[in-house]
Amino acid sequence: MLNEFIAIRRELHQIPETGYKELKTQAYLLDYISKLPSGHLEVKKWRTGILVLVKGTNPEKTIGYRTDIDALPITEETELPFASKHPGNMHACGHDLHMSIALGVLTHFASKPAKDNLLFVFQPAEEGPGGAKPIMESTEFAEWRPDSIYGLHIAPEYKVGEIAIKPGLLFANTSELFISFKGKGGHAAYPHLANDMVVAASAFVGQMQTIISRNIDPMDSAVITIGRIHGGEIQNVIAETAYLDGTIRTLSPETMEIVWTRLKQLAKGWEEAYQCEVEFHPGSDYYQVDNDPVETEEFIHFLEEQYPESYVPARSAMTGEDFGYFLSEIKGFMFWLGVDSEYSLHHAKLNPKEEAIPFAIDVLIHFLESK
């Protein structure tokens, strides 16, 4: 018989929605939650997200658990029988698994409340524009603000049954990067009468990499990736505009500041050298996921005692996750959950092993009961 929460994952997988558009997802979650024993539950909506408080039997504190609920604008290529029914959208980062795990844990505690309050945060817009910071600033969250908070993220590179975690920095600081170049278009036969923005933008892509190699301490780490370039409209017209979209990832906020300062300095030079306008457009910023050392060591000890084959020491990764905003103010941690997939996160063929769902539910129930 198919595990109930694997079945839920498959249903959620078919209705992927991007940030702040998770209307069907929110409705699905609310419908499921409405069928749980309600004696200890309080539910609030926040935009397209949900907060659920499970009142404890003798509460002295509130423990938070956060899951993200949004999907990515990716066309799915898995050919699964439960593939996305929303063309151009896919749960390619595992948030469908994250939600089903959270529902599994919530279901248990709705029937068997813990001593302390438990707050379940179903957060929208993790992939962009970033939902963690605004939900934290909401009055809904403030009323139930937890004393500690936890979360997980699936990891294709780890096996099912493995949990990877480390104290301190787990995920990097991440900034989205959107740059526009505006010059003067013209006929391809007369380049001397135009300012070619394809040339300007292309040269900028190469030059910005010197920030990493020449302005960042070699013992530190940072990466600038340009994932999309667009310039011009037709083959025989010199492009008047060009656009670069990408990300910056660093291991500290200070290094992020260095990268941004140098990018803006380079842009001023580009305006002079290429007789153009260079403009930076706002995107999402993701604060580093910095695991609380005491909380993390407590969880590692729990794993070693209860799941001795599961614990794997993690390494810091350049991945971005807005859960870092929670951890910047509230003690807690995030861990990697092994799902053993051939394809990486954000890949159109990502197909996590679903056995990780009941395993994660079991681990989280026992851990939260131990708190």
Swiss-Prot record:
UniProt xrefs under CDD domains: M20_Acy1_YkuR-like
GO MF annotation, one: N-acetyldiaminopimelate deacetylase activity
Transmembrane segments: none
Pathway this chain belongs to: Amino-acid biosynthesis; L-lysine biosynthesis via DAP pathway; LL-2,6-diaminopimelate from (S)-tetrahydrodipicolinate (acetylase route): step 3/3
Alphabetized UniProt keyword annotations: Amino-acid biosynthesis, Diaminopimelate biosynthesis, Hydrolase, Lysine biosynthesis
Disulfide bonds: none
A biological-process GO annotation: lysine biosynthetic process via diaminopimelate
Keyword Electron transport: no
Signal peptide: none
Active site positions: D68, E127 (proton acceptor)
EC number: 3.5.1.47
This protein's record includes keyword Hydrolase: yes
Substrates-to-products reaction catalysed: N-acetyl-(2S,6S)-2,6-diaminopimelate + H2O = (2S,6S)-2,6-diaminopimelate + acetate
Record function comment: Catalyzes the conversion of N-acetyl-diaminopimelate to diaminopimelate and acetate.
Family of this protein: Belongs to the peptidase M20A family. N-acetyldiaminopimelate deacetylase subfamily.
Name by which UniProt lists this protein: N-acetyldiaminopimelate deacetylase
Organism (species): Listeria monocytogenes serovar 1/2a (strain ATCC BAA-679 / EGD-e)
